[in-house]
């Protein structure tokens, strides 16, 4: 049985949190809510917020449990359409039904992993419990939730597989390089350098920072990500022990049928291999609500994060307030605004030029700027279609 340490206050960097093989990564919960609020939320009672958050928690768990049913329906539809072809055309592809059967086996395997993940997350938070599932049975999940879940499976590729190494090198290495440059071990005690990684996803960037000896805390809002990162960070100690089939949902742009059903192994490293005395934790909740203590962080590292805001200026304001004087903000990512064109959602879509002007008006000093850092995001490396982002990398400093 692994033992847990008490989680640090969600709005503060962890202090002197020892980490060894028998100590789990601490997960503490702030306010997560039922969905991302459109602008300033209209506050209900605390009881209403707790109820909505509890419902959302179980709704996401239900999506994990419903995955197999949803995906089998998708494959069955494909088979029905194939069987509707003239018999002479079906005979041209005798291997096609066999391929669908292979996909079904992959679905069943993915479902086993997803059930393992959620079976371990009921009591994952140090400071919050969500009771028991009031419904008690698996219900159909929304298309939105199933898309989020399929996207989460691809996050395992990006963060914790050998296949995702090239993508991590493109996205994470430039950030880590700037951290090392600004906080060299010759002049800093890394354990005293508090680094925050908002939008931590499955936690690999934050983990890599902690591996260097820095005191690091990841923050994530999505239960899909939180359940999965808890599983990897706290339940996976054997390299490449687990297998997933992340590409079986992609029925287009496959060069070969085998490409669709190829597996990935995870984790490619032992997440428990952090150095003795490491200070690493995760918080769950809205970045802007959880982090309210002024002048608390030496460094904030954001990767593919700032375009998740309804209003990116709110993010800039929060970062300005919580950074220590002399602290730095490192950002890498595109501006694919998540709430653009969504009905009833506030979405302020600024150009990089506008964001840069706002950042400078707050008082940040620009130290590094690269406007064409080429990267992908959860890319299928064998797909016939790939998206590439020309990301912006900047480093700004809050004056002393």
UniProtKB/Swiss-Prot annotation:
Residues binding carnosine: 307, 338, 389
Enzyme class, broadest EC rank: transferase
GO cellular component: cytosol; nucleus
Chemical reaction(s) catalysed: carnosine + S-adenosyl-L-methionine = anserine + S-adenosyl-L-homocysteine + H(+)
Localisation: Cytoplasm, Cytosol; Nucleus
Region annotation (Disordered) ranges: 1-51
SS bond partners: none
Biased composition (Low complexity): 28-44
E.C. no: 2.1.1.22
UniProt GO BP: carnosine metabolic process; methylation
Keyword S-adenosyl-L-methionine: yes
Keyword Repressor: no
Molecular-function GO terms, alphabetical: carnosine N-methyltransferase activity; protein homodimerization activity; S-adenosylmethionine-dependent methyltransferase activity
Binding site residues for S-adenosyl-L-methionine: 155, 158, 199, 220, 286-287, 303, 315
The entry's keywords: Cytoplasm, Methyltransferase, Nucleus, S-adenosyl-L-methionine, Transferase
InterPro entries reported in the protein's UniProt record: CARME (IPR012901), SAM-dependent_MTases_sf (IPR029063)
Pfam families named in the record: CARME (PF07942)
Domain comment as written in the entry: The Gly-Xaa-Gly-Xaa-Gly (GXGXG) motif binds the adenosyl part of S-adenosyl-L-methionine.
Similarity comment: Belongs to the carnosine N-methyltransferase family.
Role description: N-methyltransferase that catalyzes the formation of anserine (beta-alanyl-N(Pi)-methyl-L-histidine) from carnosine. Anserine, a methylated derivative of carnosine (beta-alanyl-L-histidine), is an abundant constituent of vertebrate skeletal muscles. Also methylates other L-histidine-containing di- and tripeptides such as Gly-Gly-His, Gly-His and homocarnosine (GABA-His).
Oligomer and partners: Homodimer. Each monomer accommodates one molecule of carnosine in its active pocket, precisely anchoring the histidine imidazole ring such that only N1 is exposed and deprotonated for methylation.
Listed name of the protein: Carnosine N-methyltransferase
Name of the gene encoding the protein in the UniProt record: Carnmt1
């Amino acid at each position: 049985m692994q033992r847990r340490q008490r989680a640090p206050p969600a709005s503060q960097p962890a202090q002197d949190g020892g980490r060894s093989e028998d100590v789990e990564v601490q997960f503490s919960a702030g306010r997560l809510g039922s969905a991302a609020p459109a602008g300033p939320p209209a506050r209900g009672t605390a009881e209403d917020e707790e109820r909505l958050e509890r419902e959302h928690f179980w709704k996401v768990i239900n999506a994990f449990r419903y995955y197999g049913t949803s995906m089998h329906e998708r494959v069955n539809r494909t088979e029905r359409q194939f069987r509707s072809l003239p018999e002479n055309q079906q005979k041209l592809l005798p291997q096609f039904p066999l391929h669908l059967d292979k996909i079904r086996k992959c679905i069943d395997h993915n479902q086993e992993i997803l059930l393992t993940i959620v079976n371990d997350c009921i009591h994952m938070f140090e400071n919050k419990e969500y009771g028991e599932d009031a419904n008690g049975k698996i219900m159909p999940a929304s298309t939105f939730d199933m898309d989020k879940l399929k996207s989460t499976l691809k996050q395992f590729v990006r963060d914790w597989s050998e296949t995702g190494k090239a993508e991590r090198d493109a996205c994470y290495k430039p950030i880590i390089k700037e951290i090392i440059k600004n906080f060299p071990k010759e002049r800093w005690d890394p354990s005293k350098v508090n680094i925050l990684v908002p939008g931590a996803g499955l936690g690999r960037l934050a983990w890599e920072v902690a591996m260097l000896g820095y005191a690091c805390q990841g923050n994530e809002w999505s239960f899909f990500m939180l359940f999965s990162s808890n599983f990897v960070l706290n339940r996976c100690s054997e390299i490449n022990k687990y297998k997933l089939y992340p590409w079986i949902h992609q029925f287009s742009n496959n060069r070969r049928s085998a490409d669709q059903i190829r597996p990935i192994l995870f984790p490619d490293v032992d997440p428990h291999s952090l150095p003795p005395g490491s200070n690493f934790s995760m918080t769950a909740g809205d970045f802007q609500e959880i982090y309210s203590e002024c002048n608390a962080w030496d460094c904030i590292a954001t990767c593919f994060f700032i375009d998740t805001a309804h209003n990116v200026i709110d993010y800039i304001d929060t970062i300005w307030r919580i950074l220590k004087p002399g602290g730095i903000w490192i950002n890498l990512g595109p501006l694919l605004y998540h709430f653009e064109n969504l009905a009833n959602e506030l979405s302020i879509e600024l150009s990089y030029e506008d964001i840069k002007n706002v950042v400078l008006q707050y008082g940040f000093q620009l130290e590094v700027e690269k406007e064409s850092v080429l990267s992908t995001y959860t890319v299928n490396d064998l797909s016939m279609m790939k998206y590439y982002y020309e990301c912006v990398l900047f480093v700004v400093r809050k004056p002393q």
